[in-house]
Amino acid sequence: MPMIDADGCLLNVSVEGRDGGPTLMLSNSLGCTLQMWEPQMKALTQLFRVIRYDRRGHGKSGVPAGPYSMERFGRDVLTILDDLNIEKTHWCGLSMGGMVGQWLGANAPERLNKIILANTTSKGNCVNTIQNCNHGTDKVA
C-alpha cells in the first residue's frame, strides 16, 4: 500500500481492482480504517479500480496535531487523486466519509462522477465528536 504525503501527513492508501476500469473511492466512518470495506472488496474489484484510504488520525495514516476540518479531509482526498493521476472518481462515503464527499461535491465537483452518501449528515463538529468518542458512551447510557 502506498503512503501519500498530504501537507506533511502520510496517508495510508490502498489501490486494488481492474486496471483501466472506472475508479471508485471509498471513505470510511469516524474511528474506522480502510479495512471496514474488506467484505465488499471481492465484488467491487471485479467492476472497479477501488481506492481506500485511512483518513488522517485513523489506521496507519499519520496523526498530526489538530484541529481537523472537512476542508482538510477533502484536500487530503484531492492530494490522493492527484498523486495517483486520477482525474475523476466515483465516491462512496459512509457517515463521516459522506461528509467529506459533500465537501468534495461542493468544492471540487469536477473530480467526481457519482456520489453515494450513506448514513451521513450535512454538518457536524469533528472536534466535539472525537472528544465524545474519547469519553465513551457513559453520558448516553
Annotate each PLM feature.
Residues 99-107, 112-141:
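Flexible "cap/lid" loop of the alpha/beta hydrolase fold
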Residues 9-66:
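Conserved HGGG/HGGXW glycine-rich cap/lid loop of the alpha/beta-hydrolase fold
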Residues 54, 90, 113-116:
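Residue in the alpha/beta-hydrolase core beta-strand immediately N-terminal to the catalytic nucleophile
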Residues 28-30, 89, 93-98:
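Conserved alpha/beta-hydrolase "nucleophile elbow" surrounding the catalytic nucleophile
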Residues 1-10:
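N-terminal cap/lid segment of alpha/beta-hydrolase-fold proteins
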Residues 61, 95, 119:
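Catalytic nucleophile serine of serine hydrolases
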Residues 73, 91-93, 118:
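Short beta-strand immediately N-terminal to the catalytic nucleophile in serine-hydrolase-like folds
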